[in-house]
Design a protein with these regions (language model features):
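Feature marking well-ordered beta-strand scaffolds used for ligand recognition
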Residues: 1-339
Length: 339
């Protein structure tokens, strides 16, 4: 259904209720908007999560977990694909400044060379977790001119223009993944700040990008802006959510998957988090090949402590829990010096 009357009152009953699911044929409902076109992505990007949009003149740049696309939207009723750049990595948020395109990479499988084979090793020189920089002066032939690695990757980022600095642009990075091993990126630490002042927790990264030499982009500051925050009060999960989580955990356990107590409930730990840890255990015993049952048993015993360290301690510790160790998005207002 569609409503475009300009009314400030939401339609009732809610037209979104009961819409059918689908990849390209899902049900739709709009309010005060008109759909001008529906253009599918190229096949390599279909069925893969899309992320952010950025705009440059007549172009829309569409982030996707398999890379990014550039669309000519001069005619919004018939967008034309200009560039499709295959470069898998979550979450591929995009921003553009002049001729530079910035793309976030956070997942464990993203590669520096943009290959689709992923990265299985717990520690690898091929992994990209951080910020990719492309020169899109020739928008049909973008060039990867720089990469900046960070300890927690880049879930999202924000481009910041300092009105007093015309030679550089700055990118604020927020990474929400686990801290990578120091063997992969020296200086990374998942210890609490009181144990290690160089901890990668509770901070963002500020990257300085020289406009004339973007290949020299580098981290220039890591402000610990979340220090001393405490976990906000929570009303807890709804009974149906608790029941669904318990059912999912029981089914996962029956299939041999990993579960652990986290935030007061048994949770399923996703394979993409488990695989690198198993690989590390195999490597620690100088083994090769897939993990054994004994390796899995070692990880199951260690997992509660690993999760407690990564996600803020256990519920038995007295006092308020630590607050978030990262944020999702960063909003800035450079003209008044606020973020």
């Amino acid at each position: 259904s569609s409503t475009s009357s300009g009314s400030m009152t939401a339609p009732s009953p809610d037209p979104r209720v009961g819409l059918k699911a689908g990849l390209m044929d899902a049900g739709e409902a709009t309010w005060n908007l008109r759909v001008l076109s529906r253009t599918p992505s190229p096949e390599r990007f279909l069925g893969v999560t899309n992320s952010d949009l950025a705009f440059l003149g007549k172009y829309a740049i569409q982030g996707n977990y398999n890379g990014w696309q550039i669309w000519d939207i001069s005619d919004p009723r018939a967008p034309a694909l200009t560039t499709a750049y295959f470069c898998p990595a979550s979450q591929s948020d995009v921003s553009v400044y002049r001729n530079l395109l910035f793309v976030s990479g956070e997942g464990l499988t993203g590669r520096i060379d943009c290959g689709g084979q992923g990265v299985r090793e717990a520690v690898s020189k091929d992994r990209l977790r951080g910020l990719r920089i492309f020169d899109i002066t020739d928008i049909r032939n973008p060039r990867n001119v720089g990469n900046v690695q960070t300890c927690r990757g880049s879930h999202t980022h924000t481009v910041v223009v300092d009105p007093r600095d015309t030679e550089n642009v700055y990118v604020y990075i927020s990474g929400s993944a686990g801290v990578r091993a120091a063997d992969e990126l020296p200086g990374c630490s998942r210890e609490a700040p009181e144990k290690d002042p160089n901890s990668a927790l509770f901070r963002i990264e500020v990257i300085k990008v020289p406009l004339a030499h973007p290949e020299r982009a580098a981290i220039v500051s890591s402000p610990r802006i979340f220090q001393d925050l405490v976990d906000p009060a929570s009303h807890g999960e709804a009974p149906e959510d608790i029941a669904a989580a318990a059912k999912a955990a029981a089914e996962a356990r029956a299939r041999g998957m990993f579960t652990a107590e986290l935030f007061g409930a048994e949770r399923v730990i996703p394979p993409q988090m488990i695989s690198p840890m198993l690989d590390s255990i195999v490597k620690a015993r100088n083994g090769t090949g897939p993990a054994t049952a004994a390796d899995s048993a070692v990880l199951r015993a260690a997992l509660p402590g690993i999760l407690a360290a990564r996600f803020g301690g256990d519920d038995a510790t007295p006092g308020p829990r630590p607050g978030p160790t990262q944020c999702h998005d960063i909003t800035v207002y450079p003209a008044i010096g606020m973020a």
